[in-house]
Amino acid sequence: MTLKALAQSLGITLKYLFSKPVTVPYPDAPVALKPRFHGRHVLTRHPNGLEKCIGCSLCAAACPAYAIYVEPAENDPENPVSAGERYAKVYEINMLRCIFCGLCEEACPTGAIVLGYDFEMADYEYSDLVYGKEDMLVDVVGTKPQRREAKRTGKPVKVGYVVPYVRPELEGFKAPTEGGKR
């Protein structure tokens, strides 16, 4: 190695030694997500509180990873669950199989399923990574592990991201502010 090459390599090292780090201190500082980020699935509702999902199973048919299971049922006219003739009695998404491509969102004729902003879904049990309808409704804050940790500690659900723009499809979804709180 020549003296010139040694000086160049030391110069590069010194340049990066005193520059701003590229890495983000993720757990301590919230991460700014982009508007088209694909995260945890959210099942939306109409303004009157009825579910938008009509149990048509088009999202399951569009899913290339076969991660979605929908079991439709007839809607009771006296006590409707959704605005259509049917509703999703069982709606499950296996988050281990899901590739977060967004094809389910595109296939949905009512705009019921939207890919939200939650991405912290690591868990220990396989069964905890199969999200049911009650885990994905729009008024549910955080993922299963986040809710379990909040229940254990008695603190509110803490999310590690900041969304500068909230998609209009996520009606009722409270995006966190700059401090990382909703």
From Swiss-Prot:
Report residues binding [4Fe-4S] cluster 2: 63, 98-99, 101, 104
Q: Which UniProt keywords apply?
A: 4Fe-4S, Cell membrane, Iron, Iron-sulfur, Membrane, Metal-binding, NAD, Quinone, Repeat, Translocase
Which is one Pfam family of this protein? Fer4_7
Which positions in this protein are listed as binding [4Fe-4S] cluster 1? 53, 56-57, 59, 108
Reactions it catalyzes: a quinone + NADH + 5 H(+)(in) = a quinol + NAD(+) + 4 H(+)(out)
Name a GO molecular-function annotation: NADH:ubiquinone reductase (non-electrogenic) activity
Q: Which cofactor does it need?
A: [4Fe-4S] cluster
Its GO biological process annotations read: aerobic respiration
Where's the 4Fe-4S ferredoxin-type domain? 43-73, 89-118
Membrane topology of the entry:
Peripheral membrane protein
Cellular compartments per GO CC: plasma membrane
Cofactor binding: number and manner: Binds 2 [4Fe-4S] clusters per subunit. The [4Fe-4S] clusters are referred to as N6a and N6b.
Which major enzyme category is it?
A: translocase
What are its E.C. numbers?
Answer: 7.1.1.-
Q: Where in the cell is it found?
A: Cell membrane
Q: Which InterPro entries match?
A: 4Fe4S_Fe-S-bd, 4Fe4S_Fe_S_CS, NADH_quinone_OxRdtase_chainI
Q: Which family does it belong to?
A: Belongs to the complex I 23 kDa subunit family.
Q: Do you know which PANTHER family this protein is assigned to?
A: NADH DEHYDROGENASE [UBIQUINONE] IRON-SULFUR PROTEIN 8, MITOCHONDRIAL, NADH DEHYDROGENASE UBIQUINONE IRON-SULFUR PROTEIN 8, MITOCHONDRIAL
Record function comment: NDH-1 shuttles electrons from NADH, via FMN and iron-sulfur (Fe-S) centers, to quinones in the respiratory chain. The immediate electron acceptor for the enzyme in this species is menaquinone. Couples the redox reaction to proton translocation (for every two electrons transferred, four hydrogen ions are translocated across the cytoplasmic membrane), and thus conserves the redox energy in a proton gradient required for the synthesis of ATP.
Subunit description: NDH-1 is composed of 15 different subunits, Nqo1 to Nqo15. The complex has a L-shaped structure, with the hydrophobic arm (subunits Nqo7, Nqo8 and Nqo10 to Nqo14) embedded in the membrane and the hydrophilic peripheral arm (subunits Nqo1 to Nqo6, Nqo9 and Nqo15) protruding into the bacterial cytoplasm. The hydrophilic domain contains all the redox centers.
Q: Identify this protein by name.
A: NADH-quinone oxidoreductase subunit 9
* Species of origin: Thermus thermophilus (strain ATCC 27634 / DSM 579 / HB8)
